[in-house]
Design a protein with these regions (language model features):
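Extended catalytic cores of very large enzyme megasubunits
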Residues: 1-145
Length: 145
């Protein structure tokens, strides 16, 4: 386990002294439990966690890639750059969260209540850092009754 300062220090080394990148990693993506104990101190640790989880799934299929082959694709963000929720959620046993960044919801019904229901769904997703898309063509244009 590590503390926040150790995560910042190790992440700054990984990001060649970039304080902003280190801070974003530490606050959004480093594996941490509810008590504030960190289990990853740099993106390299995160890439190991992701590789382990991807391999767990891969191993269920014929000709799986090895955990190390997967890690080599992720290492240093050279070939694959997982985004947002997947980086913090995949293989994370300390919190339950969605690993999807974007959601498509039903088109709103053309009524006050229907629009409010869609708005409530949008707000619930947005407060959990998700992006939302929906088709508004079901709503009457202005001036039509």
């Amino acid at each position: 386990m590590a503390d926040f300062e150790q995560v910042i220090t190790d992440s700054q080394k990984f990001f060649n002294g970039d304080d902003l990148a280190a801070s974003v990693f530490a606050t959004k993506y480093a594996l941490c439990d509810k008590a504030g104990n960190y289990y990853e101190t740099s993106p390299d640790d995160m890439h190991r966690r992701l590789s382990k989880e991807f391999y767990r799934i891969e191993s269920n299929y014929p000709n799986p890639m090895s955990e190390n082959e997967i890690y080599e694709l992720l290492k240093g963000f050279k070939y694959i750059v997982p985004q947002g929720s997947p980086m913090s959620g995949i293989g994370n046993t300390h919190q339950i969260q969605s690993i999807s960044n974007c959601f498509v919801i039903e088109s709103p019904h053309d009524s006050y209540g229907g629009i409010c229901k869609t708005d409530q769904e949008l707000v619930q997703i947005a407060k959990r850092r998700g992006g939302v898309g929906f088709d508004i063509s079901s709503i009457r244009p202005k001036g039509l009754s």
